[in-house]
From Swiss-Prot:
Biased composition (Basic and acidic residues): 299-312
LRR repeat ranges per the UniProt record: 74-96, 97-118, 119-140, 141-162, 163-184, 188-209
Family of this protein: Belongs to the DNAAF1 family.
Cellular component GO terms, alphabetical: axoneme
InterPro entries given in the database record: Cilia_flagella_integrity, Leu-rich_rpt, LRR_dom_sf
Record's protein name: Dynein axonemal assembly factor 1
Gene that specifies this protein: dnaaf1
Lineage: Eukaryota, Metazoa, Chordata, Craniata, Vertebrata
Primary subcellular site in the record, as a coarse category: other
């Protein structure tokens, strides 16, 4: 029995060792499988190609041809690769002349492969999947960098960009002030957009103070705005070069009031604001006064032009043109008073009576006939005196000017009493009379006028061919429309009361209506009438007594 138990125990021990060996072998196999799987995964990750469109040479060539760009890569300075769905930056090695690269609205996860773009000025990478700022050292001439709407947590690797002036990094995940310490090493940045991030530490102002050229700052959408007391005034005072904060510009008035607030509190700010308001009102009033002065000068110029068109204008003296307007006014007033007194004295002394005026005018007209052989001297003297009188009347008023012109017409000149000077200018027009010797007389011939007495006496004769009498002056025939033959015979009988037949009466009525085309002289007609009178012995005596006038003068 003992031997059997020993054999069984030995057998159980052998089985246990076998199971342990099998377990260890299985564990080693499982570890080997895990290592092989991880290695295969690494290899597969390295060998997997990015999905989606890629930036290839063929694509860039077709893109340049489509957008009418240069087919030679280095000649292009701008590439528009936005809204294409690219996941990485590649294939830009030959485009060494690029100055502006648009890669917005793609699926780019990393900034890379930009070593050959040393001339790049603007890089637009907003609305992508970028997590870190890296590989920007070759872009030494970069001026504008837009990485908005990404997943950036730390601002880094931009201190090497010495020409960077605009950084737009809004809508990211910036939170801690230490993550933005890189900004203090970028003195060239003048436009900084940090809006809509997770910034809440007021110590950000200390970093912004170290940026000497910062002019435009946007912190909207951050909690730090609520944690800084008097946010706008504080930033305006501490950032000396700031000209635009958030959504509003910083005017000089705002800066002056903020500095007064920092120095004297609310009272100092109120005083400074009142001073600025009074200054602004003064400027507005000065501008209104200037506009009023311009309008008055324009109105005065218009009135002067209208007066000059009418012939009444006050000419400024040539000597006083260089003087100021106040001096001109002060000089004109005494001149007007002196001219008034002189003109009144001259009019009272030199105004002659109407008889003397007629006598002077007649004598002047007689003397002008005698002085015709010397026309040049009189013309020159009259022209000189005209200029003198015009220059004397330049500064006078319209009333004085009329009096002066009247004295010129009425008073003869002192140099030559024989010549009457007429000055052309505003005022009444004077008509000069011509001497009787120069008047040309036309003698009209006395033509005989034909009257009624010159015409011969005509007797009433019975004649069927009575011709109308024509004279030199055209006479219009009197035409009457007769309705029937009876009325025609009655009308003829009333004109010719002697007895005659109906045929003769009809012929006579037709002759009265018809117009004769023959031209017979008065003598021929008189002989015809005498022959008719001799032949008509059978005319009754009663008809001879009643004679009618056949010829009448018509107006």
């Amino acid at each position: 029995m003992k031997t059997k138990m020993i054999v069984s125990t030995s057998m159980n021990a052998g089985e246990g060792t076998r199971t342990e060996a099998e377990d260890t072998s299985k564990g080693v196999a499982s570890l080997a499988d895990l290592d092989s799987q991880s290695a295969a995964a690494e290899v597969s990750e390295s060998d997997i190609k990015p999905s989606g469109p890629r930036i290839t040479k063929d694509f860039l060539r077709e893109h340049c041809k489509k957008n009418k760009l240069y087919l030679t890569p280095r000649l292009n300075d701008t590439l528009y690769l936005h809204f294409k769905g690219f996941s990485c930056i590649e294939g830009l090695e030959e485009y060494t002349g690029l100055r502006c690269l648009w890669l917005e609205c793609n699926g780019i996860r990393k900034i890379e492969n930009l070593e050959n773009q040393t001339e790049l000025r603007c890089l637009f990478l907003h609305q992508n999947l970028i997590h870190t700022l890296e590989n920007l050292e070759p872009l030494s001439k970069l001026c504008t960098l837009n990485v908005s709407n990404n997943y950036i947590k730390v601002i880094e690797n931009i201190s090497s960009l010495s020409d960077l002036s605009t950084l737009q990094i809004s809508h990211n995940t910036l939170g801690n002030v230490c993550d933005m310490e890189e900004l203090s090493h970028c003195p060239s940045i003048s436009v900084l957009d940090l809006s809509h991030n997770r910034i809440s530490d007021p110590a950000l102002v200390n970093i912004l103070e170290k940026m000497p050229d910062l002019r435009v700052l946007n912190l909207m959408g951050n909690e730090v705005i609520k944690k800084i007391p008097n946010y706008r005034k504080t930033l305006i005072v501490r950032l000396k070069q700031l000209t635009y904060l958030d959504d509003r510009p910083v005017f000089p008035k705002d800066r002056a009031c903020a500095e007064a607030w920092a120095a004297g509190g609310l009272e100092g700010e109120q005083k400074e604001r009142e001073m600025w308001q009074t200054r602004e009102r003064r400027k507005i009033q000065e501008s209104l006064d200037a506009m009023t002065a311009i309008r008055e000068t324009a109105l005065k110029r218009r009135q002067d032009r209208e007066l000059s068109e009418k012939g009444i204008i006050e000419f400024p003296s040539p000597v006083a043109e260089d003087q100021s307007p106040h001096d001109e006014i002060s000089d004109i007033e005494p001149a007007e008073s002196d001219s008034d007194s002189e003109t009144t004295q001259e009019q009272t002394d030199a105004s002659p009576s109407p008889s003397e005026m007629d006598h002077n005018f007649n004598s002047a007209s007689d003397d002008s006939d005698q002085s015709q052989p010397q026309p040049n001297e009189s013309v020159h003297s009259s022209f000189d005196e005209e200029q003198i009188r015009q220059s004397a009347t330049w500064g006078l008023k319209p009333k004085e000017e009329k009096n002066q012109i009247l004295s010129i017409y009425t008073k003869p000149s002192q140099s030559d009493q024989r010549v009457l000077i007429s000055v052309s200018g505003p005022g009444a027009l004077v008509t000069e009379l011509i001497s009787e010797d120069e008047i040309e007389s036309i003698n009209l011939s006395d033509e005989p006028v034909l009257t009624i007495d010159d015409l011969p006496d005509l007797e009433d004769e019975e004649n069927s061919h009575i011709l109308p009498i024509t004279s030199q002056s055209g006479m219009r025939p009197k035409i009457e429309v007769i309705s029937s033959i009876d009325t025609e015979s009655e009308a003829v009988r009333s004109l010719y009361p002697w007895p005659h037949s109906d045929a003769v009466a009809l012929d006579q009525s037709q002759q009265l209506i018809s117009v004769s085309t023959t031209r017979n002289s008065v003598k021929q007609q008189s002989t015809a009438f005498t022959s008719l009178a001799e032949a008509g012995d059978d005319v009754p005596k009663a008809a001879e007594k009643r004679k009618t006038v056949l010829i009448e003068e018509l107006d």
